From Swiss-Prot:
Pathway(s) of this molecule: Amino-acid biosynthesis; L-lysine biosynthesis via DAP pathway; (S)-tetrahydrodipicolinate from L-aspartate: step 4/4
Lineage: Bacteria, Pseudomonadati, Pseudomonadota, Gammaproteobacteria, Lysobacterales
Localisation: Cytoplasm
Keyword Cytoplasm found: yes
Underlying gene: dapB
Keyword Transmembrane: no
Protein name: 4-hydroxy-tetrahydrodipicolinate reductase
Alphabetized Pfam families for the sequence: DapB_C, DapB_N
């Protein structure tokens, strides 16, 4: 039996994909057997890693787990491939539509699947703290302010929506503010405001590697699980 997990990285040309490739190459528990990019002219090998264009997805070699940080338009094909090959999928692709989220739930009946808007340990802890604050602060206002780099397209961010769900389930309706500026990796502020007082809970990511390390940790732990839709915090904390 191999001592490493065979890894497919989907969205390998993006910021997260590049971090994943670098960190996985430094981790002996992983071997990247395929990297999929949307704009590759044809399959090729770079630094020992086979690269495939998105159109060649069906031709990728066997893998034990896939990590996906791509765009919504490429997500459905990867999900179908993982289901067809009965392989776990870890995805951080945001901006999915309602039909794609429904497909995620259906796929969870057949494979172990993790979808998350944020794979850092700190964000997982923040979601837990926000849930606890929501229990204690009924009737308070809640505002969620997220800041990201100018190239991020979706707003509010997936992480902000996850935080909003954590308070909404406590009966508090959150309000969102999105900022796009410079090269901000990711800042999230959750503010609870009452009469004469307020509480602020903040998470700031200063390096994209925190998300890549978290995704690799989750990928390692989801292999061998029974089919189901798992939360990041189920596996990372």
């Amino acid at each position: 039996m191999d001592s490493f997990l065979r890894l497919l990285i989907h969205g390998a040309s993006g910021r997260m994909g590049q971090s994943l490739l670098r960190l996985a190459s430094e981790d002996p528990s992983f071997q990247v057997t395929a990297a999929v990019v949307g704009n590759a002219p044809h399959r090729h090998v770079s630094d020992g890693v086979p690269f495939f264009a998105a159109a060649e997805l069906a031709a990728v070699p066997a893998f034990d787990v896939a990590i996906d940080f791509s765009l919504p338009q490429g997500f459905s094909s990867l999900l179908a491939l993982c289901v067809a090959r009965a392989v776990p999928l870890v995805s951080g692709t945001t901006g999915l539509d309602s039909r794609q989220h429904e497909a995620l739930v259906m796929a969870g009946a057949r494979i172990p699947l993790v979808w998350g808007s944020n794979f850092s340990v700190g964000m997982a802890a923040l979601v837990n703290l926000v849930e606890r604050a929501g229990d204690a602060l009924s009737g308070w206002d809640c505002d969620i302010v997220e800041s990201h780099h100018v190239h991020k397209q979706d707003a509010p961010s997936g992480s902000a929506l996850t935080l909003g769900e954590a308070v909404a389930c406590k009966g508090i309706a959150p309000r969102y503010t999105s900022l796009r500026a410079g090269d901000i990796v990711g800042d999230h502020l959750v503010q609870f405001t009452g009469l004469g007082e307020r509480i602020e809970l903040v998470h700031r990511a200063t390096n994209r590697d925190v998300f890549a390390r978290g995704a690799l940790c989750v990928a390692r732990r989801v292999v061998g699980r029974v089919p189901g839709c798992y939360r990041v915090r189920d596996l990372i904390m």
